Design a protein with these regions (language model features):
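Mitochondrial intermembrane space
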Residues: 18, 36, 66, 83, ...
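A broadly tuned "polar low-complexity/structure-edge" signature
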Residues: 44-47, 51, 92-93, 148-160
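Hydrophobic transmembrane alpha-helix bundles
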Residues: 5, 9, 67-85, 135-152
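N-terminal leader/targeting segments
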Residues: 1-61
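Ser/Thr-rich, low-complexity intrinsically disordered terminal regions
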Residues: 42-56, 101-125, 129
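Non-cytosolic coordination micro-motifs
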Residues: 116-160
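Long, charged/polar, surface-exposed segments that mediate recognition or autoinhibition
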Residues: 60-112
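Sequence contexts marking disulfide-bonded cysteines in secreted/extracellular proteins
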Residues: 53-55, 64-66, 152-154
Length: 160
């Protein structure tokens, strides 16, 4: 699935940026079963998150952000799988607007892999993989959030 390119101007709007984040996360999740058939499951749990409304600015308009967007699947993966998912994550998000990709190796010896991709504006997607062991419930999850932006209708009123 190829995601339509959006201009930076479009992504300054809450609706466009929100849809782009959903599409990017969904695209990555849907692409994983190609290499990992184990992840082709109907048991993925999805949470569309919630919209938080900021205090009104000096113009009387309120920005909105979206938090808690997530996909989660309880599944047992191996170290090699986590390494391969990291490579896919890096490739997928390097070509998106969330091009600042990094890996946090701090807890990998405990079987916990964490990858994140963020935009220069501050939007972010995290991928967490917990391998089976005495401290972890084996799973893979993606979570994302969108920083505060104006809705399109508010921006139109601001420009009048």
């Amino acid at each position: 699935m190829k995601i339509k390119e959006k201009t930076m101007e479009e992504l300054e709007l809450f609706e466009a940026a929100s849809k782009d984040l959903f599409d990017t996360m969904q695209g990555f999740k849907d692409n994983l079963p190609v290499q990992f058939p184990l992840l082709d499951s109907d048991n993925w749990q999805y949470d569309k998150g919630s919209i938080k409304v900021c205090k009104a600015d000096e113009s009387g308009f309120k920005k909105r952000c979206r938090v808690g967007i997530s996909y989660n699947l309880k599944v047992s993966l191996l170290n090699e799988d986590a390494e391969q998912i990291w490579l896919l994550f890096k490739d997928w998000f390097n070509t998106s607007r969330l091009g600042q990709v990094e890996r946090n190796p701090n807890n990998e010896d405990l079987g916990r892999y964490v990858f994140s991709a963020s935009s220069p504006l501050g939007d972010q997607v995290d991928c967490s993989i917990y391998l089976p062991n005495e401290w972890n419930i084996p799973q893979i999850s993606f979570s994302g959030y969108l920083i505060a932006r104006y809705r399109a209708c508010d921006l139109d009123k601001l420009q009048e």
